Amino acid sequence: MPLCSVLGGPFMAWDAGRLTGPDGEDWRVPVSELEARRGRLAAALAEAGLESALIDDPVELYWLTGGRQSGMMLVGADGSDVSNVHWVRKSLDRAHFESGGDDSPDPVVAQPRMSRLVDALRAVGATRAPAMLAGKVPHDRWEFFAGHLDSLGATADCTHLMFGLRETKSAWELEMHRESGRINHAMFEAVRDVGGVGRTELEMAAAADEVSRAAGFGGRIRMRRWPMDCDRVVIAAGRSGAIPSYFDSAIGGTGASPISSLGAGHSKVVAGEPVIVDMVHLHRGYVSDCTRMFCAGELDFESMTRLEDMAEIRDSVVASLGRGDYCSEAWRIGSGKAAEMGYADHLMGMPPNQAVFLGHSVGLELDETPVVADRFDRELPVGGTMAIEPKVLYDTGAIGTEDTFARTSDGMECLTMGAKWGLLTEWDA
């Protein structure tokens, strides 16, 4: 790979050959992927009656450009005279390399000053203000851009248009999810190997973290919903599983401290008590989300019955999504079955802290759409990826299971461990 020149006082050279995966792999997004994504966005903009979109959110930039350098991507609608351009503030050289180098689908050039932005837009064919991501851009930044673009008219919102495009994954993206699931499996093996009586949740989480980091996890789980942030290893031993948290999910765990009040904490494994392990890995940005139960010694009959019931609810939700039911119908089926089993006041939490979903879409973010919840009156699209996670909480702890699935033309494909790993793993007591 080439040496790239950068300006840092005197001219320096940096080695692009270091921008690889853990074993020297080229981890750039294929140029064909970037071309296809920009083409889909151009078609969607035309259908929505928008002339162009100016994208500057890091996640959406990665999806469109293959990197998350500081900058903006302008995409013109099909049939418009707007030419695509990737404007970069920092680092231009790295953005050029990450988007394919000389094979990059569109020009990668220095970002204009804000005082010249309208002139730059007009130079590439824009006659109207480009749409932007009102659902992601901070209010002050939105107002700042709107003020600079007012000579081109009002700025429209294209947030849900972008979200809709990313709901359907390409074949390449699905393979990223599968590899993420394979690494997630290895994380569970690490927890199995180090866990047992007396081990703290954080000790077990550290073992899983080591596997994930070695495989290339970058340290950040991205979420859409403000003010959510996520510790991607939630391990809750015994009664820790019943502790509520800010996180919009069934379980939160104790966390390590009040500022980190989600995930693994200082509680220890006790013989006979349920230990729930819910772990996320990102492979080149793509999420896998999986949950399994552990116990030192034998799990009591009542808890085991609850676990088997959660697996039955999971199967009913997966079957519903696979045959094309609306996500709201999958929710009604799953939550209705839970109510019939006697879990209405314990499903996905305990009052008043119950979450009201049974599955969430995943991709480059943990909390994508659609969701298995009321009012999501649409299907999971073919190519959509979703984590299905029925769980119940009691004062004795949390019980549940979770795998990540993709909808295919033939039904639902499990992208994580699925049947390869049982519902319960027992450590020696």
Regions found by a protein language model. Give the residues of each.
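Active-site neighborhoods and metal-handling regions in enzymes and metal-associated proteins
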Residues: 2-429
